[in-house]
Amino acid sequence: MSPTTPRSVEPSGLKPEQLPPSYFTWPGLLGRLGNGQELSEAQVRWAMNEIMEGNATDAQIAAFAFGIRVRGITAAELAAAAETMTSFATPVDFSDVPNCVDIVGTGGDGHHTVNISTMASFVVSAAGVPVVKHGNRAASSKCGGADMLEALGLDIERSPEDIRQDAHDTGFAFMFAKTYHPAMRFAGPVRSQLGAPTIFNLLGPMTNPAYPKFGLIGCAFKEFMPIMGGAFARQGSRVLVVRGMDGMDEISVCTPTEVVTVDAAGRTGEEVINPRNVGLDFYEDGSLVGGDAEYNADVAVRLMKGEISGAIKDAVLINAAGALTAVRGWEENGFQETLREQVQIAREALESGAALKQMEKIVGKEF
């Protein structure tokens, strides 16, 4: 756990003890935000430490979390906040699970879809790539990834030892954010009271305690896509940060999808995904709408059994392909060609029945 007094050296070259007394105080920090100034990484770490240790008041948490988002967070600030928050998480060692990937989004897109990323996770793991999914219950929709997995029969509150074993046995592990980020209990009530996106929406996808090096990251907020990409680059991750032009925090099959790519060398780029360019199709808005946990779980079972085609199937395939592209890399063959190849790999995993068997193995029962 990080100390309350930051040890980092400021850009000016001054050490913390040489800085003004107000530098590491809420009035000083919030004053900088109010004036439109950037915070140093040390100030962000100090603020996150205060929040995670339970030393900050609700008013201070709200002012920081909402204020830094409204002012416009930088990649350096976001990376510092993510690093500090993850240092308070329950640690899990996945160093012996190579090439694991997370498929996760910020939420808050208002589309209330079926659980695309969770279904895509079954397909990805069936294709031989381990998934360490970091998720939670629904916040603004009827059913989050944790809700659907629980409805399928998975015990979501599993110990670090259990999920390590899950990853080895099945190629899939689910880390329930509420369990693995206990310090977030200090910020949770404020987030609920605000009812508006804050820095914590961006931090959720960046604070997987397993530290996966690869990810398909949905971002519902267009203006923060390059910021998240820059922060992931600082973490040394290879990811795709995606947002459908319909606002969906997934790769959409209702519109093209904008992508910020972060490659293995930390270079960022931009792409656009068109489903028709990878052998899939476009569908009407609303064709991915889901329901409660039982409904979405039933959709997952029917999809894996081959009883569902069309929009939901294509959405799962293209998002699974996005995650596989992040793991396998696009530097050699180009992004679009790599994605097209991975769609076919995802299709084989789903249509062969391998994804159904994988889901049954993960939840421990047959459907």
Swiss-Prot record:
Positions that bind Mg(2+) 1: S117, E250
Requisite cofactors: Mg(2+)
Residues that coordinate or bind Mg(2+) 2: D249, E250
Residues the record lists as binding anthranilate 1: G105, N136
GO biological process: L-tryptophan biosynthetic process
Binding-site list for 5-phospho-alpha-D-ribose 1-diphosphate: 105, 108-109, 113, 115-118, 133-141, 145
Keywords for the protein's UniProt record, in alphabetical order: Amino-acid biosynthesis, Aromatic amino acid biosynthesis, Glycosyltransferase, Magnesium, Metal-binding, Transferase, Tryptophan biosynthesis
Catalysed reaction, written as an equation: N-(5-phospho-beta-D-ribosyl)anthranilate + diphosphate = 5-phospho-alpha-D-ribose 1-diphosphate + anthranilate
Entries under InterPro entries matching the protein: Anthranilate_Pribosyl_Tfrase, Glycosyl_Trfase_fam3, Glycosyl_Trfase_fam3_N_dom, Glycosyl_Trfase_fam3_N_dom_sf, Nuc_phospho_transferase
Pathway where it operates: Amino-acid biosynthesis; L-tryptophan biosynthesis; L-tryptophan from chorismate: step 2/5
Cofactor note: Binds 2 magnesium ions per monomer.
One cellular component term from this protein's GO annotations in UniProt: cytosol
Gene Ontology terms, MF aspect: anthranilate phosphoribosyltransferase activity; magnesium ion binding
Entry binding sites for anthranilate 2: R191
Enzyme Commission designation: 2.4.2.18
Function text: Catalyzes the transfer of the phosphoribosyl group of 5-phosphorylribose-1-pyrophosphate (PRPP) to anthranilate to yield N-(5'-phosphoribosyl)-anthranilate (PRA).
Annotated NCBIfam families: trpD (TIGR01245)
Subunit structure: Homodimer.
Family statement drawn from the similarity comment of this UniProt entry: Belongs to the anthranilate phosphoribosyltransferase family.
Record's protein name: Anthranilate phosphoribosyltransferase
Organism: Corynebacterium jeikeium (strain K411)
